[in-house]
């Protein structure tokens, strides 16, 4: 029997939600930390991996923290993306299910989204190892070729590099389509670039580590409303997510929830890794 990884995205999908789910499923944290530490990224950042209680369940929390006013803070800052209307989100259950001979369940995650401002009601443990980079910021932003070079220069396996490059390509093509430019001219700027690079690399490392045979996404659940970003006020789904869904045939279900549940990086992960949109009739869990 093959090992199929099933993502139940009842509360959407983002990069850090995906990494946390994969760690809870059994991806090796030591391998993830060591491999991320070899990425030649100039900007300082910290990786926080901790256990948190959500809906009375013990779950993994994965955060990329970037410096702000002398402190390392959650990267979801107002200067990147903010909701038009302030509200709290508790995203429950992006469950990653590995259907095969061996299986772990991952339930109820309440995670921040890549490059978006969400008010989270949870705290983070600081008693864990942090991965740092200690040089100056990369002010001009990075293009896809430069980011591919970062992956290539790391100790990521060939399989993980291939996954990361597929995710990056999907994201870059969507951004190029949104802005009416060539993929080679797309740049990911400032903090959002670091966050996206880490989330993409971490997802690829964990997926490769789990060694699954296929990935199932039946549907992505999305909210409604607007988000305020560097380009102004955008509708939900944001244009990059819409482009990814259209280009790759992703199925969406819209919920009566205000706010963004599917981020561009999350949609790119789904589009780049999906092998089926249908669950098998019977399976071992």
Name what the model sees in each region.
Residues 24-174, 178, 238, 247-267, ...:
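Glycine-rich nucleotide/cofactor/substrate-binding loop typically near the N-terminus or early
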Residues 23-28, 203-212, 232-240:
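A glycine- and small-aliphatic-rich helix-loop capping segment at beta-alpha/alpha-beta transitions
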Residues 1-5:
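Extreme N-terminal starter segment of soluble prokaryotic enzymes
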Residues 7-22, 188-211:
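Conserved phosphate/anionic-ligand binding catalytic regions in large, soluble enzymes, centered on
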Residues 18, 59-61, 74, 227-234:
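Short acidic, glycine/serine/threonine-rich loops at helix termini
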Residues 7, 186-190, 216-219, 254:
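General beta-strand structural signal in soluble alpha/beta enzymes
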Residues 212-285:
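Mobile "lid/hinge" segments at catalytic clefts and subdomain interfaces of large enzymes
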Residues 11, 39-40, 53, 192-194, ...:
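Acidic, glycine-rich active-site loops and adjacent beta-strand->loop/helix elements
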């Amino acid at each position: 029997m093959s090992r199929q990884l099933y993502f139940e995205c009842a509360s959407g999908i983002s990069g850090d939600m995906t990494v946390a789910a994969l760690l809870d499923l059994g991806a090796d944290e030591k391998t993830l930390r060591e491999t991320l530490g070899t990425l030649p990224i100039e900007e300082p950042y910290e990786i926080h991996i901790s256990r948190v209680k959500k809906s009375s369940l013990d779950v993994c929390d994965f955060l990329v923290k970037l410096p702000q006013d002398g402190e390392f803070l959650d990267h979801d800052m107002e200067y990147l993306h903010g909701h038009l209307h302030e509200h709290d989100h508790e995203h429950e259950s992006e469950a990653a299910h590995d259907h095969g001979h061996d299986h772990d369940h991952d339930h109820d995650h309440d995670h921040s989204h890549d490059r978006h401002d969400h008010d989270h009601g949870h705290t983070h443990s600081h008693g864990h190892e942090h991965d740092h980079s200690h040089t100056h910021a990369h002010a001009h932003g990075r293009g896809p070729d430069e980011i591919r070079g970062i992956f290539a220069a790391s100790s990521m396996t060939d399989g993980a590099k291939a996954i990361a490059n597929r995710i990056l390509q999907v994201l870059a093509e969507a951004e190029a389509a949104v802005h009416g430019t060539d993929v080679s001219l797309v740049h990911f700027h400032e903090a959002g670039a670091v966050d996206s690079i880490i989330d993409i690399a971490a997802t690829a490392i964990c997926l490769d580590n789990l060694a699954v045979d296929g990935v199932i996404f039946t549907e992505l659940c999305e909210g409604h409303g607007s988000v305020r970003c560097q380009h102004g006020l955008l509708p939900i789904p944001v244009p990059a997510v819409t482009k990814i869904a259209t280009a790759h045939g992703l199925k969406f279900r819209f919920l009566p929830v205000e706010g963004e549940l599917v981020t561009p990086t999350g949609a790119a992960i789904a589009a780049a890794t999906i092998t089926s949109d249908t669950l098998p009739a019977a399976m071992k869990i």
